[in-house]
Swiss-Prot record:
Protein's recorded name: 3-dehydroquinate synthase
Gene: aroB
GO BP annotations listed: amino acid biosynthetic process; aromatic amino acid family biosynthetic process; chorismate biosynthetic process
Organism of this sequence: Mycolicibacterium paratuberculosis (strain ATCC BAA-968 / K-10)
Record note on cofactor: Binds 1 divalent metal cation per subunit. Can use either Co(2+) or Zn(2+).
UniProt binding sites for Zn(2+): 186, 249, 265
Superkingdom classification of source: Bacteria
């Protein structure tokens, strides 16, 4: 796979198709992608105010009436009051149907700005500029938008494909190491469900896999985005196949909710991946070596592979509200082999308990 620092484009073949442009120093591409717009709103997280202002000024120099809208960081920005605030500001500045939004930030910014774009005037264009690894390989690609409520994570949302996605790898240099590592959980997920070469690259040199200066991480980003683009093209609205992108997320979302979103999404998904692998192994669907490989790869990256031993009853309660459930029946994405995702519906409580026991952290109780 091409890994030079020249821009690489991955096409997401939905209707209409759109590009995910991967490279460095890509902000200059934004003007051309947006085209002729009267007004543009740049939705950004606080730490990116300076970059957002650079974008705003650049657009203003082109004659665009450009505005910055700051939203809270991380999961604090993914709720109805924040969306209501965005609607209010979009109305005040007069964003019309021919205008556009730009999201600048991590996955939470992509989710909430995308939801605002999907619902404002029943849909306006948006370009995503993800600045975290998680945003690049997951949230910004595929058109899923959403917010959190007391009922659960991402249960309120809409499908709204972006006009384009700009993945500027240079922004990874600004991430705290633990934020970069957390994003690797989604990369590992892509490897297990569809592209084992991702796993080989990480195992060969885990340290290089999280080095934003190297070519290994650049290739991992490209490969993970390509996996998601292929799945989204085959099943845009998550009628069936796209569910495989939720591998590890059933327990992961429950952990996030139990932790009141203080855990990073990737950290929770990492534990969820180990749990899903144990479920499949104990159900006789996944070989021991591949199940064990989950734990070794995630651990090598510095991601968590265990959780509070006493938490299962509460986690089961939260998982019951998972969007993959059907008629109250709990469903998991599992593996029937490497890069062979399947489903496990209505697992016996004893199986759930045994799988959880395999990752329970007695010290966290």
């Amino acid at each position: 796979m091409r890994t030079t620092r020249e821009p690489v484009t991955v096409q997401v073949a939905v209707d209409p198709p759109y590009p995910v442009i991967i490279g460095t120093g890509l902000l200059g591409e934004l003007d051309e992608l947006l085209g002729a717009r009267h007004k543009v709103a740049v939705v950004h997280q606080p730490v990116l105010a300076e970059t957002a202002e650079v974008i705003r000024k650049r657009l203003a120099d082109k004659g665009v009436d450009a505005h910055r809208i700051e939203i809270p960081d991380a999961e604090d920005g993914k709720d109805l009051p924040v969306v209501g605030f965005l609607w209010e500001v979009l109305g005040r500045i007069g964003i019309g149907r021919k205008d556009a939004l730009v999201s600048l930030g991590g996955g939470a910014a992509t989710d909430v700005a995308g939801f605002a774009a999907a619902t404002w005037l029943r849909g306006v264009d948006i370009v995503h500029v993800p600045t975290t690894l998680l945003g690049m390989v997951d949230a910004a690609v595929g058109g899923k938008t959403g917010i959190n409520t007391d009922a659960g994570k991402n249960l309120v949302g809409a499908f709204h494909q972006p006009l384009a996605v700009l993945v500027d790898l240079a922004t990874l240099h600004t991430l705290p190491p633990n934020e970069l590592v957390a994003g690797m959980a989604e990369v590992v997920k892509a490897g297990f469900i569809a592209d084992p070469a991702i796993l080989d690259l990480i195992e060969a040199d885990p340290r290089a896999a999280v080095d934003p200066s190297g070519e290994v991480l650049a290739e991992l980003v490209q490969r993970a985005i390509a996996v998601k683009a292929d799945v989204v093209a085959a099943d845009e609205k998550e009628s069936e196949l796209r569910e495989i992108l939720n591998y590890g997320h059933t327990l992961g979302h429950a952990i996030e909710r139990r932790e009141r979103y203080r855990w990073r999404h990737g950290a929770a998904v990492s534990v969820g991946l180990v749990f899903a692998a144990e479920l499949a192994r104990l159900a006789g669907r996944l070989d021991d070596a591949t199940a064990r490989r989950h734990r070794t790869i995630l651990s090598a990256l510095g991601l968590p592979v265990s959780y509070d031993a006493d938490a299962l009853p509460q986690l089961l309660e939260y998982m019951a509200g998972d969007k993959k459930s059907r008629a109250g029946v709990l469903r998991f994405v599992v593996l029937d082999g490497l890069a062979k995702p399947g489903r496990l519906a209505g697992p016996d409580p004893s199986l759930l308990a045994a799988a959880y026991a395999a990752l329970a952290d007695e010290d966290a109780s």
